[in-house]
Amino acid sequence: STLLASSAASDVYKRQVSDETDNKAGAECNTRMMLTGQVFAVMSGTATEEQIQAICRSADAYLYDRKAGGYRLNTDFKEEKFDLGRMFGFAYGEKENGAVFSHMAVMYANALYKTGHAKEGYKVLQTLLDTAMDFERSKMYPGIPEYFDNQGRGLYAYLTGAASWYMLTMITEVFGVKGQLGDMVIAPALMPEQYDHCLLYTSPS
């Protein structure tokens, strides 16, 4: 019965991947990587420390594109596959097909900070900020767009929840102010270069 259940689950997975139950995601030898799977593996605590380090190295090697604005959602699969959701209906670098998708990028940063990888998390957040604030390139008001395209242009700022995740990460992970079992914990994870840009306000006693 276990074998049957496993087989049935596999068939369901394949149907979700492809309407034709033809799972070819890893059929070719070309390197293919998607950020989403890495993020949830780290954020859920499933990935080991060794695996997290490998994820960071691979993401830097295959997904990071400074010109585009940071970490792309996936590598270029170089195919049109219209039975795999809407992802491959877009040209590479647009929306879900390989754009720098701000929401997932910020969640990646959050996951890295939570697991003690502040340097790597800082790189994610800072690249997004630098791209958004480069108005000649981003061509948008200050803020976080849904995604940056191949040229680093910010698009659809009203469609994303990335800003709330960015603020959450800055407050609870970068500045390290969070609650824990009824206590307030302050455990900042600031990089040395951030100290010159931080101010501490205290109320008069």
Language-model segments: which ranges?
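Single conserved hydrophobic/aromatic residue that forms the stacking wall/gate
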Residues: 2-9, 13, 201-205
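Extended glycan-interaction surfaces of carbohydrate-active proteins
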Residues: 10-100, 126-129, 133-148
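N-terminal alpha-helical segment
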Residues: 5, 101-105
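A general alpha-helix detector
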Residues: 37-38, 104-108
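Non-catalytic C-terminal accessory modules of carbohydrate-active enzymes
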Residues: 61-66, 78, 89-97, 107-203
